[in-house]
Swiss-Prot record:
Domain topic, free-text comment: Domain I is involved in oligomerization and binding regulators, domain II is flexibile and of varying length in different bacteria, domain III forms the AAA+ region, while domain IV binds dsDNA.
Compartmental location: Cytoplasm
Subunit structure: Oligomerizes as a right-handed, spiral filament on DNA at oriC.
Chain spans, region Domain I, interacts with DnaA modulators: 1-82
Lineage of source species: Bacteria, Pseudomonadati, Pseudomonadota, Gammaproteobacteria, Enterobacterales
Role of this protein: Plays an essential role in the initiation and regulation of chromosomal replication. ATP-DnaA binds to the origin of replication (oriC) to initiate formation of the DNA replication initiation complex once per cell cycle. Binds the DnaA box (a 9 base pair repeat at the origin) and separates the double-stranded (ds)DNA. Forms a right-handed helical filament on oriC DNA; dsDNA binds to the exterior of the filament while single-stranded (ss)DNA is stabiized in the filament's interior.
Record protein name field: Chromosomal replication initiator protein DnaA
Organism: Sodalis glossinidius (strain morsitans)
Region (Domain III, AAA+ region): 128-344
Residues annotated as binding ATP: G172, G174, K175, T176
Record's keyword terms, sorted: ATP-binding, Cytoplasm, DNA replication, DNA-binding, Lipid-binding, Nucleotide-binding
Amino acid sequence: MSLSLWQQCLARLQDELPATEFSMWIRPLQAELSDNTLALYAPNRFVLDWVRDKYLNNINGLLNDFCGTDAPLLRFEVGSKPPQMAVLQPASQHASEAPSQAAVARPRPSRPSWDNAPVQPELSYRSNVNPKHNFDNFVEGKSNQLARAAARQVADNPGGAYNPLFLYGGTGLGKTHLLHAVGNGIMARKANAKVVYMHSERFVQDMVKALQNNAIEEFKRYYRSVDALLIDDIQFFANKERSQEEFFHTFNALLEGNQQIILTSDRYPKEINGVEDRLKSRFGWGLTVAIEPPELETRVAILMKKADENAIRLPGEVAFFIAKRLRSNVRELEGALNRVIANANFTGRAITIDFVREALRDLLALQEKLVTIDNIQKTVAEYYKIKVADLLSKRRSRSVARPRQMAMALSKELTNHSLPEIGDAFGGRDHTTVLHACRKIEQLREESHDIKEDFSNLIRTLSS
């Protein structure tokens, strides 16, 4: 056996796992094979625990496939694999200080000297990080699990894990919360860390002021000497050529210094119109992760946690009632709950389903008016450039069947209709056909980036 065994495992895992999962969890691992033991080295404890919990069976299964009864034992360690004696350099060259591999699409020059970074007293940094947003009060679900995990790793290992980290998704899904959580995590680790959070428009405004005041060099020095730069809604750089030019050079300078960059957007990097290709390319150098609208269970958990923070008893059936009717984003959910709580405080009434119907009657009526099966069918047909009649027909070609399955899945997600009712609306189909369509789309969202994007785009369109 040789180290090529791990290369074979990597090749199979890359084929079997979604690209984001492979880049985030498997690619960072280093392997050492000796004495019939395969040691896998993870960059930190968080990655080690995750890989051991989620992928141990996959890896052991591959080792058995490739080696049979001669399969090596598997061992996990935190850190980098020991240097091989044959390639050791003299101590003066510090060969043993070589960095561990980072899970990025582009190699990093060197590990950051984070703990020894000099502080420049002549510059005053304002972090703008909201201390209320942290990882503990971020409700995790299937829709945001990878994004939270990636953000947590960046907070634990800024400049070394995923750089840049690019989070994208619709409005009100938790991107900004994660930015602040990372900032708070970094500053908890190092109190004097220079962490700057801002909206992209603030960067533009600062650059314009610097140009007006002939202070562009100070502007450059400020932004290029931070330890972590967290920029929200990067899509607002669109068509601002001078701002893009300056950010391009700032981006390069930060990456070369292994200073952390985290960006958010409402869309996938390559879909941001009005932004230069060279910038969009750089956005994808590290790790790009989507945040999707929360599923029902996560929406319920968000409501229960928010109620608990406000010392309000929210019955479970009421939380489910609200969550099943308001699906677009977290901000809308929290706003609805705030209205319910305020009404309950003003009237002194108990929070029941009937009370919620009354308190949110205009919001619920608008939601039901906007999202109907008919509207979903029209939106999906327009998105895929087919006719609504095709969705209702018996045609089974993939160009029609896949959009039909998507429309059925969206109808289940966004309306309160039963499976038989949805089937009737799609040409009198059986409820088992609808169930199969929903399961198929759920599976494809895990396996196909395109289907995942289509689902998110359609949810965003229908919920706006």
